[in-house]
Amino acid sequence: MNLNNLGGYEDSNRTLNNSLNYPTQKALSPSLKNMNYQDFLSITEREQPEALASGNTAINTVVSVTGATLSALGVPGASFITNFYLKITGLLWPHNKNIWDEFMTEVETLIEQKIEQYARNKALAELEGLGNNLTIYQQALEDWLNNPDDPATITRVIDRFRILDALFESYMPSFRVAGYEIPLLTVYAQAANLHLALLRDSTLYGDKWGFTQNNIEENYNRQKKHISEYSNHCVKWYNSGLSRLNGSTYEQWINYNRFRREMILMVLDIAAVFPIYDPRMYSMETSTQLTREVYTDPISLSISNPDIGPSFSQMENTAFRTPHLVDYLDELYIYTSKYKAFSHEIQPDLFYWCVHKVSFKKSEQSNLYTTGIYGKTSGYISSGAYSFRGNDIYRTLAAPSVVVYPYTQNYGVEQVEFYGVKGHVHYRGDNKYDLTYDSIDQLPPDGEPIHEKYTHRLCHATAISKSTPDYDNATIPIFSWTHRSAEYYNRIYPNKIKKIPAVKMYKLDDLSTVVKGPGFTGGDLVKRGSNGYIGDIKATVNSPLSQKYRVRVRYATSVSGLFNVFINDEIALQKNFQSTVETIGEGKDLTYGSFGYIEYSTTIQFPNEHPKITLHLNHLSNNSPFYVDSIEFIPVDVNYDEKEKLEKAQKAVNTLFTEGRNALQKYVTDYKVDQVSILVDCISGDLYPNEKRELQNLVKYAKRLSYSRNLLLDPTFDSINSSEENGWYGSNGIVIGNGDFVFKGNYLIFSGTNDTQYPTYLYQKIDESKLKEYSRYKLKGFIESSQDLEAYVIRYDAKHRTLDVSDNLLPDILPENTCGEPNRCAAQQYLDENPSSECSSMQDGILSDSHSFSLNIDTGSINHNENLGIWVLFKISTLEGYAKFGNLEVIEDGPVIGEALARVKRQETKWRNKLAQMTTETQAIYTRAKQALDNLFANAQDSHLKIDVTFAEIAAARKIVQSIREVYMSWLSVVPGVNHPIFTELSGRVQRAFQLYDVRNVVRNGRFLNGLSDWIVTSDVNVQEENGNNVLVLNNWDAQVLRNVKLYQDRGYVLRVTARKIGIGEGYITITDEEGHTDQLRFTACEEIDASNAFISGYITKELEFFPDTEKVHIEIGETEGIFLVESIELFLMEELC
């Protein structure tokens, strides 16, 4: 390359002097004072080690390969692809050089490791074979493209593709031989680039070549696997090589930085474009940007004593910037100082660049940011601003110099010329030293003229200063460069995909940060802060504002949540995203598989030519890191949305049915059918009337199939608690909703309950006649949101889940149509990827954040007489509980086999054994209870009680009846159990006995069922429940309970009382007529209890006969001290004894 050909903007009168301003490697002796300047130059030339060679073949080649690759990304068109192969083969297999050997030699030099000769020769031979076959394939592809219907060209291109693909699969391992992975890495990366480009052709042209769809899919999946494999290999061994060169001295850092710079150019830059070879993700020409920075060598001669120079860590920590948003150089403000020469006869004084600060802008922003000072301004003699505003600096020429003293040297840069596309800028401390340091030796252009073919632009300048009292002084500027593709404007095009790296943001949230990238992304990553806002990007829309775009975001995280895209502060896109990895570390440690894409199904249109795009997160499942790599804009045609809706609906409808459309697929739920129906409803009837009508008919047919396989009656909840249909039975607290954003049909709304004994519930029993023996059935449904919702399916035992589901399906502001109705078409994007039951989490028996749910139940043998059936129950037993759910169904899933069959047989046997035991137990209780009840009644018709039957005896019979188990189902106390008929029979007789008891008792409310009603009491008397009975409680000696009762005079009565005394003293019941005739029953705590007369421990029944002389009598209950409990007071005519 002719370095004097600087393009039209450069100074054609300047002649570049190739003499080197290098010092000797040793401190010069005092004899310097006797030298003249020409003698000094003679010594420096004689003792200077060989300089970095100009025109590095390996680097020159890879920057051209990268340029060619960037221009052919995505699917740029057939001519671009053939020209790409033609250019690449010319670059990598030129006639007069072995470029692959140059690649190996370059890395061998950097890491000082030679490849074993056999491995080297084998790799070179195989590369030669690949080059020959690639040329043949390129010609065959071009011939076929020119004659696509010619069978001969088709056969030839297929043969050449398969041969070349097989060679790549066979030879790639030779480019990663164990022990030589690093020196072979450039070869590996460049070969991988070609293999991925080849595999792209299979997806693009495979159907036209006659490949089967399976063959195309196999090749495509292999390509995706290789993208990941090749990317990870490149990064792994790049990092390994870099860590191998870690050191402690300045010279070691120089080599370390050269390895980093050259391997970025030769390996990582090309690895960054591997994903874009995926022709399904990148289906058109694609524009991407390499935002990584590379650093050219410090502008300095070799320091004579490396031990006194800047240390490795100082260079890395000071010269190398921390990760940051991409910025663009606007101005350098440079200070100049002077080193006085030891002798002007030997050399002139050195006016040198001593300090500077940098002003820069961020992408598409007018704000100017200025750094602090690099260096120390003390002692400077002049300063000035050097503006580069809007001028890409693609090349620098510098004059690194040294002033030599007998025992020390002072290093500095006398002048630098900055060559830009709009002209050049010259910093000149003086003009006595020659421009010998050329940046294009390290960052060459992709051809000539340089101002058109440059590959990098200057973006920043750092500096290292090192001085000690007795040794070398040095102020060393260090330039950093970005790739030319990382342009200032984020241009969005009408005809190609635009991939904007996240580090092109101009503003981040205060807690969001830029972190080091993993190496294969072409730059660094943005890591979210603690809140939802991430940052803002400015874009330039180079297309009509009517143009529509799809959007996707490349990200890595171990959290799930909602990703929002705002345009000009208005919400444009929202979508739920899932974690891409289970655990995640720092950005630099991520692998290719750590990343995924958030793809939005709806399109956007930009409101103006320079929109602000904001990235935002919501509803994160935890605080783990979230990394953003890039956001992509894919142009689509004006009817893309409607076409996508049609294709999406067609695909969705087809996936509902089994082959032949005779039945629904097993995995298809009733909710899914409804959602597909909504997709069909959203199809444009104007653009696709026939297709929409056909799909509507199919989805209606699918809904009928869904109803027909559903074993539940009334799946639309039209007849809850109906006396005409044996379907759903429910409690209060249930509302039937209809037609919202989530549900197309009816759905249930459950509220919480104030009493756990009376939950909000809904249940249904599926009749035995609907079931098959030894079969599995599934209860399925969909929950919009819920808390403490319990779902049961019951046969031999209960399968139970508590369902807590977050209300995270829809945004806070819901889209509505012009009539104020739910706009389901607009809301569909939020429901496209609902979490399924397989993605839910289970903790402490609670199924969380699963909108779709499913519970299994298996049948054993079928017995229509027993009619065990399957019970389905939903309930909420807490005040805080709520639920909104629907699309309930129970469907047959198939026969149970193997372990499941054995398990259900064991369950049935266990259930039958339990049932037999229960039957025996119940029969024994029934016999006892029947006998006890028979003893209460005077006749078989249960129309009269025996006169001597006491309250305690009735209560004792009731206790026996209440000991019967399985009267109601354990999971819901209102559903009759297996012993409910027996219990109902016996309980009816108990109730009849109490009714007859109350009828013959002339003392109303004698069992205190109505509390203190009809009694006159003092304030300290109360009634409390004890063992199913209401008991009158007197706690103090002055407590008093009174009652007046009207009787027949001159008739005999029996006063019978069941009571209990606690503590000292006595309790009493006194009966007195108006003439003062009195009688009394007394109770004490020390009385002997007649077991036959005792119902509950401590309670005693006593009676007396009373013959009133007046119509009215007075009853008084009291005590002398302690506590007195009265269960029942009965007063009845003695004639009842007859």
From Swiss-Prot:
Keyword Phosphoprotein: no
Gene Ontology MF, one: signaling receptor binding
Keyword Calcium appears in the UniProt entry: no
Disulphide linkage map: none
Domain of life assignment: Bacteria
Gene3D superfamilies: Galactose-binding domain-like (2.60.120.260), Pesticidal crystal protein, central domain (2.100.10.10), Pesticidal crystal protein, N-terminal domain (1.20.190.10)
Any single biological process term in GO: sporulation resulting in formation of a cellular spore
UniProt keywords, alphabetically: Sporulation, Toxin, Virulence
Family annotation (InterPro entries): Cry1Ac-like_dom-VII, Cry_V, Galactose-bd-like_sf, Pest_crys, Pest_crys_dom-III, Pest_crys_dom_I, Pest_crys_N_sf, Pest_cryst_cen_dom_sf
Miscellaneous comment as given in the Swiss-Prot or TrEMBL entry: Toxic segment of the protein is located in the N-terminus.
Name of this chain's protein: Pesticidal crystal protein Cry7Ab
Source organism (scientific name): Bacillus thuringiensis subsp. dakota
